A protein has these predicted regions:
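Active-/binding-site microenvironments in catalytic and ligand-binding cores
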Residues: 1-246
Length: 246
């Protein structure tokens, strides 16, 4: 068994989508090691005992995250009401990295071409665009010139019965796409197709992913939630060839 971490590390001051609140801010909590060590006493095996905690301020759309239907429509379900069963289970990886480029949109034909004949889509579909290669090296370009789906691609995935779509880009819609069609078709219709954005490491996955998880925190009134996305593989599947920096 091999576990593949598909989430970006959350750090104070990290780059973020220009339309979302600033990156995480870590504030001093109510406990600090120096102060608690003065009154917690000692343990015979571990010496001086101390504890620390902190307060973290962050957006529901920080780093690798899942969009709740509320993100795209008034009076829609929030992050606390995301169906966990839709975001956990077997997944299909569609490698569309040959189209990788600034503001490129992936259409239904591209998705169909990435699916071998005779293969059916799993309820969870992961889109490997290779755009995440510049997440750390050129974050401004990563966020402002990202890739996304066309409307017909979103309709194709919904018609196939997909319940969750993940992408290694900051948004399921490219920044120049009017009307945000992928968000609308996925999040404003029932049942919703949950959207996981800012994935990484998809180049390490095979076509058939035995187990994928991206569980949201049950945050009431939030339009999204950071997730610790990961895949569990039965064995080392080998790797896709990593694309050059877009």
């Amino acid at each position: 068994m091999r576990i593949v971490d598909l989430s970006h590390r959350l750090t104070e001051g990290m780059a973020h989508h220009p339309m979302h609140p600033r990156a995480p801010v870590v504030l001093t909590g109510s406990l600090a090691h120096d102060s608690t060590a003065r009154w917690m006493g000692e343990h015979p095996d571990f010496g001086r005992v101390s504890f620390v905690n902190e307060q973290i301020v962050l957006s529901g759309h920080t780093g690798t995250h899942v969009d709740a239907p509320l993100h795209a429509g008034r009076d829609r379900p929030d992050a606390a009401d995301i169906d966990l069963a839709a975001c956990v289970g077997a997944a299909t990886l569609l490698d569309v990295s040959e189209h990788c480029g600034p503001r490129v949109v992936i259409c239904a034909a591209d998705l169909k071409a990435a699916l071998p004949d005779g293969e059916a889509l799993a309820p969870i579909v992961l889109l490997y665009t290779a755009w995440s290669a510049i997440h750390d090296t050129d974050p401004e370009r990563y966020y402002r010139n990202s890739m996304g789906l066309t409307e017909d691609a979103a309709l194709y995935l919904r018609a196939a019965g997909v319940r969750c779509v993940g992408i290694d880009a900051p948004s399921i819609d490219a920044p120049h796409t009017p009307g945000a069609p992928a968000h609308m078709h996925f999040l404003r219709r029932d049942p919703p197709v949950y959207v996981i954005e800012n994935l990484r490491g998809l180049d390490e996955l095979p076509l058939r992913v035995p187990f994928f998880s991206a569980a949201a925190l049950p945050i009431a009134s939030s339009s999204g939630s950071p997730v610790r996305a990961y895949a569990v593989l039965d064995a080392d599947p080998g790797q896709h060839t990593q694309k050059e920096t877009p």
